[in-house]
């Protein structure tokens, strides 16, 4: 499903938070949306592997990497695991690598930057906790919608089948 965050902002302005424009799209999907699972980890992606092995249907992994762009938290192997388990997307407050491979995957990926350096996979970090970046506080269970224009957050799923929506807003 495709989302237009500008249109969603116009319709649901009282019900959403808009994340500051810190992110670029690195995945093969230009837009994505779903319920978030939060992770906080700094320059270590071991916990991401554990979480992305779960069923990701209608889910987005939201990663607070402390804004570090010194080491990439997401690479092609990790993103491929997300695709295999049907995740909608990954948002990284940090960096990714292997961007050419990421752009070929049927997965939404937004991050701050790309860098070739990888990180260890020791499993250090926490999941399902409150995280804050980009002027927004995220909780596991919130709903996130992203496209090339930006990222928005809602406590509840947006009524995407409402008659209010433009016909081009959603495409299968």
Swiss-Prot record:
InterPro entries: RraA, RraA/RraA-like, RraA/RraA-like_sf, RraA_gpbac. Keywords: Cytoplasm. It is found in: Cytoplasm. SUPFAM superfamilies: RraA-like (SSF89562). One of its GO terms (biological process) is negative regulation of RNA catabolic process. Signal peptide: none annotated. Gene3D superfamilies: Ribonuclease E inhibitor RraA/RraA-like. Pfam families: RraA-like. One of its GO terms (cellular component) is cytosol. CDD domains: RraA_family (cd16841). Transmembrane segments: none annotated. GO terms for molecular function: endoribonuclease inhibitor activity; enzyme binding. It comes from the Bacteria. Belongs to the RraA family. NCBIfam families: NOT-MenG, PRK09372.1, RraA_entero. Homotrimer. Binds to both RNA-binding sites in the C-terminal region of Rne and to RhlB. Globally modulates RNA abundance by binding to RNase E (Rne) and regulating its endonucleolytic activity. Can modulate Rne action in a substrate-dependent manner by altering the composition of the degradosome. Modulates RNA-binding and helicase activities of the degradosome. This is Regulator of ribonuclease activity A. The lineage of its organism: Bacteria, Pseudomonadati, Pseudomonadota, Gammaproteobacteria, Enterobacterales. The gene is rraA.
């Amino acid at each position: 499903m495709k989302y237009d965050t500008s249109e969603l902002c116009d319709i649901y302005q009282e019900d959403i938070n808009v994340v500051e424009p810190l992110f670029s799209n690195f995945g093969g999907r230009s837009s994505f949306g779903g319920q978030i699972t939060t992770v906080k980890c700094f320059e270590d992606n071991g916990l991401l592997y554990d979480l992305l092995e779960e069923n990701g249907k209608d889910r987005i992994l939201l990663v607070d990497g402390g804004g570090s762009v010194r080491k990439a938290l997401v690479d092609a192997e990790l993103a491929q695991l997300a695709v295999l388990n049907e995740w909608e997307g990954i948002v990284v407050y940090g960096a990714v690598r292997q961007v050419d491979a990421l752009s070929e995957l049927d997965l939404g990926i937004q991050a701050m930057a790309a860098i070739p350096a990888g990180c260890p996979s020791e499993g250090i970090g926490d999941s399902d906790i409150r995280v804050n970046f980009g002027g927004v506080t995220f909780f596991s269970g919130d709903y996130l919608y992203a496209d090339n224009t930006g990222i928005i957050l809602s406590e509840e799923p947006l009524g995407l089948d409402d008659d209010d929506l433009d016909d081009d807003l959603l495409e299968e």
